[in-house]
């Protein structure tokens, strides 16, 4: 029987919307798990990404961005999910953007000050800072805000200093047995990952035209005799006008979304995928907590 020590722990990635938390998670894992888009609020579930390297297993919790606006049911639930994942972790990675500091950053910081877990401050997108002379004073300002475990300037996009973050994480993992098998990347089901891939393509190809009132339900996910998967996805929007937008002229938009989503699914599932998409109007779902529960938005709260 092996007596080699193993280390395992949970790490929360927190920050206001759109600072690059999902991109950082994907870089730390070495592959795409969390949906990334230039649009704020694209992460709606607490996706757990698992990175196992030798005796070390880091389990990452990718929170929705904590934000001030709490009017709609979906925003309240997203804030609750983010706040709850700050508790029960060994370490927190607080992601901020370049030299920007907003009331939302302040709100996240206040939540972290109340917590017990040590906090790494990841200052993302430093490669995009135009006035490099502003960077050092800003880092000094950040250092004065709380007793951070470390402050690391990074670029999640290019991977700059992401290995530094991973190294700090490894040092702070407690001695424990691994929670997941070595080849696990995420504890989310393939069905969930399929819906996230479709939602990312919607964000990518519709951009600012489409509000957050869009979600994806996987109605069918079965293996077929060809050794692949037959997947049916239902795209839910709030208004008829949004439905037309998703379908596009003569179905061109939904066809592109389907083709691109299928490519990503085949890469992720390592099998052929037959994907069919439909669009349906379900008015007011983002305001209805029961509808959100039925779509799996609160399965982990």
UniProtKB/Swiss-Prot annotation:
Sites where the protein binds GTP: 15-22, 62-66, 124-127
Listed CDD domains: Era (cd04163), KH-II_Era (cd22534)
Region (G3): 62-65
Record keyword Transmembrane present: no
Chain spans, region G1: 15-22
Coiled coil: none
Subcellular localization(s) per the UniProt record: Cytoplasm; Cell inner membrane
Region called G4, residue ranges: 124-127
Single Gene Ontology BP annotation: ribosomal small subunit assembly
Pfam families reported in the protein's UniProt record: KH_2, MMR_HSR1
KH type-2 domain span: 206-283
PROSITE patterns listed in its UniProt record: G_ERA, KH_TYPE_2
Domain Era-type G, chain residue ranges per copy: 7-175
GO MF entry, a single one: GTPase activity
Chain intervals for the UniProt region annotation (G5): 154-156
Membrane topology field: Peripheral membrane protein
UniProt-listed NCBIfam families: era, PRK00089.1, small_GTP
Family: Belongs to the TRAFAC class TrmE-Era-EngA-EngB-Septin-like GTPase superfamily. Era GTPase family.
Subunit description: Monomer.
Name by which UniProt lists this protein: GTPase Era
Gene designation per UniProt: era
């Amino acid at each position: 029987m092996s007596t080699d020590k193993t280390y395992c722990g949970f790490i929360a990635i927190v920050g206001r919307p759109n600072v690059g938390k999902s991109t950082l998670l994907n870089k730390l894992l070495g592959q795409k798990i969390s949906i990334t888009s230039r649009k704020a609020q694209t992460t709606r579930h607490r996706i757990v990404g698992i990175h196992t390297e030798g005796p070390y297993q880091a389990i990452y919790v990718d929170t929705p961005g904590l934000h001030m606006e709490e009017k709609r049911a979906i925003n309240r639930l997203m804030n609750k999910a983010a706040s709850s994942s700050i508790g029960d972790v060994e370490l927190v990675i607080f992601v901020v953007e370049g030299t920007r500091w907003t009331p939302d950053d302040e709100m996240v910081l206040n939540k972290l000050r109340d917590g017990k877990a040590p906090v790494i401050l990841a200052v993302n997108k430093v490669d995009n800072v135009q006035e490099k002379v502003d960077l050092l004073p800003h880092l000094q300002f950040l250092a004065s805000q709380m007793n951070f475990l470390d402050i690391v300037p990074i670029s999640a996009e290019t991977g700059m200093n992401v290995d530094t973050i991973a190294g700090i994480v490894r040092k702070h993992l407690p001695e424990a047995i691994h929670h997941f098998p070595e080849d696990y990347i995420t504890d989310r089901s393939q069905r969930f990952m399929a819906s996230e891939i479709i939602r990312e393509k919607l964000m990518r190809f519709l951009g600012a035209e489409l509000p957050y009132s869009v979600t994806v339900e996987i109605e069918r996910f079965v293996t077929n005799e060809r050794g692949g998967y037959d997947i049916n996805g239902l795209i839910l929007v709030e208004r008829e006008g949004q439905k037309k937008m998703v379908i596009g002229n003569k179905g061109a938009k939904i066809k592109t979304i389907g083709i691109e989503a299928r490519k990503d699914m085949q890469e992720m599932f390592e099998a052929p995928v037959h994907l069919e998409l439909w669009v349906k109007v379900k008015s007011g779902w983002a305001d209805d907590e029961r509808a959100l529960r039925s779509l799996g938005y609160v399965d982990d709260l």
